[in-house]
């Protein structure tokens, strides 16, 4: 780093600088000392060479290899493939966190992964019609976040959104949850006439996806993300187990959805 951009003569001068060489020598010694101590610092971790880690990485790498060839990162063209891309990367991130001994972070990320699997499950089951509605709510979110430059277009979006909300009996205070969860009204799995169904994740997305058995797991992961006492005083080994089991549970369902989707739309045969 010190010699970057310097010519040979300047590099030779650096080699004569004893103070600099001593400083570099100290840094190198500290680096190797820290590397030596690293296994002790992360005693509660999943080894990257363990079957638990390597199996998950192998499954995810194969899915990523297939998906990366067809995913365009354009929701109007490859919405489901884009969502699979994010899910795969989130799952790989959880594996890396477990390797580093970041059990709390891994379990907190499982929460995001579970949210994503519920959403993609409903969107695949709902087909093109539901996916179009979901895309519309992405536009609503962009308008709400003032990400659309055309003010007239933004105004028209809000007029349309407010009309839809009024039709559903929602008030202005419900706008944020309508933007995020309003697409559920178009899902056959969401019963808007049943008071048990609500516009949120737990009583909306999760319930409609028929994965409510994970609500307790989700709640525990939510506590971790809010720096509750669980975050400060949790036992690392406990959350390593939860994150690992949770990851493989999601991975089993996601892998099944992924290959069925790819086969149904002939994606695998196109590669």
Question: What residue spans do the PLM features occupy?
Answer:
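Secondary-shell segments that build the walls of catalytic and ion/ligand-binding clefts
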Residues: 1-71, 136-271
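Predominantly late transmembrane helices and immediately cytosolic-facing juxtamembrane segments
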Residues: 124-128, 132
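A generic secondary-structure signal for well-formed alpha-helical elements
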Residues: 117-125, 228-229, 265
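Short, solvent-exposed helix-helix connector turns and helix-capping sites enriched
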Residues: 49, 102, 126-127
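Short capping loops/turns at secondary-structure boundaries
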Residues: 99-102, 106, 133, 150, ...
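Long, hydrophobic/aromatic-enriched structural stretches that serve as scaffold segments
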Residues: 58-121
């Amino acid at each position: 780093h010190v010699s970057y951009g310097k010519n040979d003569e300047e590099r030779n001068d650096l080699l004569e600088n004893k103070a600099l060489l001593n400083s570099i020598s100290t840094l190198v010694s500290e680096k190797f000392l820290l590397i030596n101590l690293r296994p002790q610092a992360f005693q509660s971790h999943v080894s990257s060479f363990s079957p638990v880690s390597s199996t998950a990485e192998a499954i995810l790498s194969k899915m990523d290899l297939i998906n990366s060839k067809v995913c365009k990162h354009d929701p109007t063209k490859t919405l489901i493939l884009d969502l699979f891309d994010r899910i795969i990367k989130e799952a790989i991130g959880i594996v890396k966190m477990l390797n580093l001994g970041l059990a709390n972070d891994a379990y907190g990320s499982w929460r995001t992964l579970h949210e994503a699997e519920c959403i993609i499950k409903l969107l695949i089951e709902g087909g093109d019609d539901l996916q179009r509605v979901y895309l519309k709510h992405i536009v609503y979110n962009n308008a709400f976040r003032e990400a659309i430059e055309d003010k007239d277009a933004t105004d028209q979006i809000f007029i349309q959104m407010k009309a839809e909300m009024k039709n559903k009996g929602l008030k202005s205070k419900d706008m944020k949850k309508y933007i995020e969860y309003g697409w559920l009204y178009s899902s056959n799995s969401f019963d808007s006439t049943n008071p048990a169904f609500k516009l949120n994740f737990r009583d909306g997305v999760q319930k409609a996806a028929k994965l409510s058995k994970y609500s307790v797991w989700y709640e525990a992961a939510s506590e971790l993300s809010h720096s509750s006492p669980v975050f400060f005083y949790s036992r690392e080994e406990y959350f390593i187990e939860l994150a690992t089991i949770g990851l493989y549970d999601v991975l089993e369902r996601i892998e099944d959805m992924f290959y069925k989707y790819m086969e149904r739309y002939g994606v695998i045969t196109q590669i």
